[in-house]
């Protein structure tokens, strides 16, 4: 029986599928698997189930001399050297569609949380309390009827747009390619990035990360935004220059931000933690029972297909 190495605990539904076809070795330590353990684990393995937090570099790929597939448990795959994997004839797959609804739900949740100051209100209610309802007390911003600007109208961005339309929001989007069919379906308008930044009340980042996207949102971009704008990032941390965001929040160049991802993840800078006008969540975009179970099935089936000589779903290289 061929061996699969699983770089961290995954839901039981996928693990059971793997156990029917492989000898399964899984990292069960606390925290992230370290490089030495990962290199040892992939030796003699024909499949690797990696997590978004698993750094699969050339050293790891070279150690996995028998690898046929690296099935990444997540929609992103910037944790893997996919070009080198291609050179070694190793398929790399991801789990794109499984994350769509969960991440779109969270994106809209972050919009509401930061605009209506829900987290601040919860903290106040649990600590000092409040003196009762008052006309000027704890005002936030309404979402309905505002303009949302979506950076990246892929599967997740489109799902965010549909949810935004339910709030009667106008939808702007930007990306490398115009998507006219999606425009008609959703009622979205394609604009360039600068136009989006200048006109949107809520700016959501739902694009995949690649080196060209690094610090897409920096000091210059924050200066373009409305002083009442909010930035929401549920994609990848390095798309936003985090220190520039901190400065924009401190200088009231924008009204607030909500982040599920961070530039130096898992570290969150103390400056961000100290600000009241930012909502922080611990990279939980697709952290639902439904999405994580589906992702578990997808990576298991991809590994099974690869060792059976079939082309797996969702190959990214």
Curated annotation (Swiss-Prot):
It comes from the Bacteria. GO terms for molecular function: NAD binding; oxidoreductase activity, acting on the CH-OH group of donors, NAD or NADP as acceptor. Coiled coil: none annotated. InterPro entries: D-2-hydroxyacid_DH, D-isomer_2_OHA_DH_cat_dom, D-isomer_DH_NAD-bd, NAD(P)-bd_dom_sf. Gene3D superfamilies: NAD(P)-binding Rossmann-like Domain. Its EC number is 1.1.1.-. Keywords: NAD, Oxidoreductase. NAD(+) binds at residues 155-156, 234-236, 260, 283-286. The active site is at residues 236, 265, 283. Belongs to the D-isomer specific 2-hydroxyacid dehydrogenase family. This is Putative 2-hydroxyacid dehydrogenase SAOUHSC_02577. It comes from Staphylococcus aureus (strain NCTC 8325 / PS 47). The lineage of its organism: Bacteria, Bacillati, Bacillota, Bacilli, Bacillales.
């Amino acid at each position: 029986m061929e061996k699969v190495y699983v770089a961290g605990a995954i839901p039981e539904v996928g693990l059971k599928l793997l156990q029917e076809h492989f000898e399964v070795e899984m990292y069960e330590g606390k925290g992230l698997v370290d490089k030495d353990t990962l290199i040892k684990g992939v030796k003699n393995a024909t499949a690797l189930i990696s997590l978004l937090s698993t750094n699969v570099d050339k050293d790891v790929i070279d150690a996995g001399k028998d690898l046929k597939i690296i099935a990444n448990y997540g929609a992103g795959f910037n944790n893997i050297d996919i070009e080198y994997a291609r050179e070694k004839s190793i398929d790399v797959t991801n789990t794109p569609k499984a994350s769509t609804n969960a991440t779109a739900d969270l994106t809209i949740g972050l919009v509401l949380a930061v605009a209506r100051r829900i987290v601040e209100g919860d903290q106040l209610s649990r600590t000092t309390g409040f003196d009762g309802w008052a006309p000027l007390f704890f005002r936030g911003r309404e979402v309905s009827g505002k303009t949302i600007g979506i950076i990246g109208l892929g599967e997740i961005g489109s799902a965010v747009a549909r949810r935004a339309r339910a709030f009667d929001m106008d939808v702007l989007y930007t990306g490398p390619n115009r998507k006219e069919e999606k425009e008609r379906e959703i009622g979205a308008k394609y604009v360039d990035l600068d136009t989006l930044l200048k006109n949107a009340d809520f700016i959501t980042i739902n694009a995949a990360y690649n080196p060209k996207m690094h610090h897409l949102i920096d000091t210059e971009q924050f200066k373009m935004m409305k002083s009442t704008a909010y930035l929401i990032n549920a994609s990848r941390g390095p798309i936003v220059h985090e220190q520039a965001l901190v400065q924009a929040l401190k200088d009231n160049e924008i009204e607030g931000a909500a982040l599920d991802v961070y530039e130096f993840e898992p570290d969150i800078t103390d400056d961000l933690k100290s600000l009241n006008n930012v909502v922080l969540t611990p990279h939980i975009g697709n952290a639902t029972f439904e999405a994580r179970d589906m992702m578990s099935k997808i990576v298991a089936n991809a590994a099974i297909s690869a060792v059976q000589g079939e082309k797996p779903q969702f190959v990214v290289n």
